[in-house]
Structure formats: C-alpha cells, structure tokens
A protein has these predicted regions:
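Glycine-centered tight beta-turn/hairpin loop motif at sheet-sheet or coil-to-beta transitions
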Residues: 117-123
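Short aromatic-glycine-enriched beta-strand elements
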Residues: 102-117
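Structural detector for short beta-strands of small beta-barrel domains
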Residues: 84-105
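Well-ordered beta-strand positions in beta-sheet-rich domains
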Residues: 91-93, 123-125, 141
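A general secondary-structure signal for short beta-strands and their flanking turns/coil
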Residues: 89, 109-111, 139
Length: 161
C-alpha cells in the first residue's frame, strides 16, 4: 500500500516553511538587536551586566540564525524532492474498491480516504480533502501516478502539477 498526497499538502508545506523561516529570522534579529543595544550600553556605562547580556543575546542570536539556516536547508531539500516528483511518471487504471467517508487525520490534516485497486497489482490510498468530489465505489478510471505518492484523476490535473 502506498500513500498518496494531494497538491494541497505541498502548498501547506510551502506555507509552513515560510512561517517557520520568518519566525526563526525574526527572533534571531530581535536577539541581535538586543545584543547590539547591550554592547552599546556597555561602552557608554562600562557595566559588567550589559557585557553579560550582550554576550548572551549574541550567542542566542547566532544559535537561532544557524538553526534557521539548517531548517531552511532541510525544507529546501524536502521541497525539491517533492517538486522533482511532481511530474507524471505513468498512467494506471484502477477501480475504487472502498471509500471511507469518515475524515481521517493524516499529519494533522483531515482527509476522506478512498482505496484504489490498481491494475498494476498495487492497492493505493487516495487522500481527498474534505469537500472534494469523492469517487463512487466500483468506479474504474485512469489515474496518473506521480512518484508513487500522488494520484491525479485526469490528464490535465497531472499536467498542471
């Protein structure tokens, strides 16, 4: 059995990446500003507490910046893998054998699941977002498999991916 994800998952992954990177950079910049402010105050006043605060803020800012860069590289690698795999690789013919109308929670997202018995001998799950048109049980149709993780219903859907 292979898991099939839709294009909405890819969009949500991209949005999540932007939010995470923005938050990481914002916090890192905030600590850099605090560190710079403390360093300036240290020179003006000559207080040791400002020196400690500036060193701590600089260390935290540097750690957050490095963490954000690592996080960015991880997301970029993940997104490039997903983007590479979004080209149609093969057509398969399959029959919907079962539809589970009760929404399932998959990676924090709610999906309606359909089990497709494909002619290539592999049963695949098709995850549909809530509100999508659910195929009827017994429907035989040509599906376009994209990197074994995503199935489009029509050729135009596959080309648009």
């Amino acid at each position: 059995m292979k898991l099939i994800y839709g294009e909405s998952d890819v969009k949500k992954l991209k949005i999540r990446r932007i939010i995470d990177l923005s938050a990481g950079l914002a916090v890192s910049v905030a600590f850099f500003v605090i560190g710079a402010f403390c360093a300036v105050r240290r020179w003006e006043i000559g207080r040791s507490s400002a020196y400690v605060l500036s060193a701590l803020s600089g260390g935290v800012a540097l750690s957050l910046l490095v963490g954000t860069i690592i996080f960015y590289l991880h997301h970029t690698k993940l997104l490039s893998f997903v983007t590479q795999s979004l080209s149609p690789s093969k057509k398969i013919s399959g029959t919907v054998t079962d539809v589970y109308n009760k929404p399932a929670n998959k990676d924090g997202l709610m999906f309606i699941t359909a089990l497709i018995s494909c002619d290539d001998g592999i049963d695949r799950y098709l995850y549909l977002p809530e509100g999508a048109t659910v195929p009827e049980k017994g429907t035989k149709k040509i599906y376009y498999v994209i990197h074994n993780n995503y199935v489009c219903g029509t050729e135009s859907e596959a080309e648009n991916e």
